[in-house]
Amino acid sequence: MSEILSLAPQNVWKHFYSLTQIPRPSGHLEKIQAFLLEFGKNAGVESFQDEAGNIIYRKPATPGMEDCKTVILQAHMDMVPQKNKETVHDFVNDPLQPYVDGEWVKAKGTTLGSDNGMGVAAIMAVMEDKTLKHGPLVALITADEETGMYGAFGLKPGTIEGDILLNLDSEDEGELYIGCAGGEDLTATLEYKEEPTDPEDVALKVTLKGLRGGHSGIQIGWGHANANKLMARFLNQVITYDEACLVSWEGGNMRNAIPRECEVVITVPATEVEDVLAFVGECEQVWRDEFATIEEGISFTAERVDLPATMVPEEIRDNLVDAIFACPNGVERFIPTIPDTVETSSNLATVEIGGGKAAVKVLTRSSRESMKDYRNTAIESCFSMAGMHVVRSGGYSGWEPNVNSPILLSLIHISEPTRQA
């Protein structure tokens, strides 16, 4: 704790640390909402919670600055609750365990919640600071952003008013976001009748873990491996060359997180077991080479398990594995006018197969509506050809960059001395 509290600026990091101690996964925000309301009361600013679960602060202008434009500071209170498989953590009740690792602040075995805890911490620092000179300030801390922006969608017209809105859900210090991708969820489902396994076969549990994962919007262009896509590559080969059958598949656990772990159970003829085990080792080495310096913690293992009674039928298995193998994933293209910025991408987030049911979830993002639709249509075609029922949901529009925005030009002018220093 002491390490984090000593980081600069201390008035922001102290609030971020306090946020790590309040459970706040999407859908379970009662504790953080109560905490933020109490903070606002103690800071002496008007504070209330609206019907959508958003927290709003209003701070009057410094005397003499009442005629300045009203600035709205916006962030979201919820976090993505993702953990390593071996980590024991209850996101609804347990505090996070943050620590300093070199130049980074991390959490032990879980996501850190800096998205968007740092934005909320910055708002808290501004709200309690009595030395700042400012015009009228409004803070909007939204609920359940990570699962569908429900707080933002539920905000009623007239609840807040202002002239300039600054979104604090960004990544790097000294950088400004001047656009934002829209998004849409795609869910493909299928029910099937299981078939009995061959009693002469051997069952193997194949586990992929140790990947970096990450946020499927911010980090989609960082080259991180997708556990579901790697597993599809493995299965494609052992089905073709080792007569493998598929019993179950469980990969990823959050729609907006790049999957870092995946586990399948397969059966193979006894004569193929050693070949499959050797191929597992080969795959790990190939992937270590492909993702050198990126996925240094990758682990791909297999172990014998008891033979399950049932499995996925051959035709269904082939269709599912082929669709997941072929599904577009990662960056589609960058913004033509801002070449280093991702415009359109998708994340093959979760795969669940077993017990007569299959479900695949993909989240597509783009700052251009036509490209978002193009990408999702390609993905939908993939799974439709596999006989799956595909539903799109939760769509929201993107925000195309305006490099001539007056607010942007003002911020560039203000930050010029800092950037030159």
Can you annotate each of these PLM segments?
Residues 65-141, 145-147, 152-163, 185, ...:
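Active-site metal-coordination/substrate-binding segment of hydrolases
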Residues 179, 196-201, 220-250, 270-345, ...:
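Acidic-enriched catalytic cores of C-N bond-cleaving enzymes acting on peptides and small amides
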